[in-house]
Amino acid sequence: MAQEPTSISALIDEWKTIAEFATEVGCGYEAARQMRKRESIAPRHWAAVIEASSKQGIEGVTYEWLARAWASAEVAA
């Protein structure tokens, strides 16, 4: 199992491609690319990201982890 990611981009990089991440999460390629670029995932995608991360064997991706990343991105914006 992979360790807890250090950032949203590090999380997305656990997949071979952004397209693969997008497919697993159920969003479009451009939405996934913007998530990576902005270091932020919209709350509407959190449940799917948590489930997809679990299937990938990525530890530590929880609602709390995503909320911290979301808050950090909001402060930086």
Residue ranges and their predicted role:
Residues 1-20, 24, 51-55, 59-68:
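A short, Lys/Arg-rich alpha-helix, primarily the initiator
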Residues 26-41:
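Recognition helix of helix-turn-helix/homeodomain-like DNA-binding domains
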Residues 38-51:
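Short, basic-rich loop-to-helix N-cap that marks the start of a DNA-contacting helix
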Residues 70-77:
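Helix-turn-helix/homeodomain-like alpha-helical modules used for DNA recognition
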